[in-house]
Amino acid sequence: MQLFHLCLIISCSCPTVQASKLCLGWLWDMDIDPYKEFGATVQLLSFLPHDFFPSVRDLLDTASALFRDALESPEHCSPHHTALRQAILCWGELMTLATWVGANLQDPASRELVVTYVNINMGLKFRQLLWFHISCLTFGRETVIEYLVSFGVWIRTPQAYRPPNAPILSTLPETTVVRRRGRSPRRRTPSPRRRRSQSPRRRRSQSRESQC
């Protein structure tokens, strides 16, 4: 979708990004959230500040260092691996397009508009997307969702009523494990004691006493 925005700007059929978005909405009429199938939303990630996310270069290096074999494998590993593959390929195509624009677009103002849009708007979206899937593969999806919810609650709480430090993703698994281990076992309601039948030995001793 973002690549098509750029194509519309370059071809001047829609002179602004806002106009291209209107055209896309008219053509497709779809509201696609890439995080919904993973239990998150774009709005949930928007609670994290922009400078929270590492650069695309750092995220790509992290993905390559941790998951290179799985990403290059022809087999399906997980939905997160598939999403990472697509994001990495899209970013590569975007860089190719940006290079072409920088070399061929004559109007300096239009060139600056495209470069700024790529670096700020699209760069942030790719940083969010890469961070989310790398974190889910590293810490687990449930932990990442719990972190996003916790951070969203923290950032929306007035400063006077919230802890001084924001939640930290790397400490959530440990906290979760401690909380699970600290659960008190369920108490079972004691059942009424059944009257035990006398054992044969007890009955034999009683019969002997009666005989005596």
UniProtKB/Swiss-Prot annotation:
Originating species: Hepatitis B virus genotype D (isolate Germany/1-91/1991)
Modification(s) after translation: Phosphorylated.
Family: Belongs to the orthohepadnavirus precore antigen family.
Localization (cell): Secreted; Host nucleus
Record region (Disordered): 172-212
GO CC, alphabetical: extracellular region; host cell; host cell cytoplasm; host cell nucleus; T=4 icosahedral viral capsid
Sequence repeat segments: 184-190, 191-198, 199-206
Protein name: External core antigen
Main localization (coarse): secreted
Listed GO biological process terms: microtubule-dependent intracellular transport of viral material towards nucleus; symbiont entry into host cell; viral penetration into host nucleus
Gene name of this polypeptide: C
Subunit structure comment from the entry: Homodimerizes.
Lineage: Viruses, Riboviria, Pararnavirae, Artverviricota, Revtraviricetes
InterPro entries: Hepatitis_B_virus_capsid_N (IPR013195), Hepatitis_core (IPR002006), Viral_capsid_core_dom_sf_HBV (IPR036459)
Signal peptide: 1-19
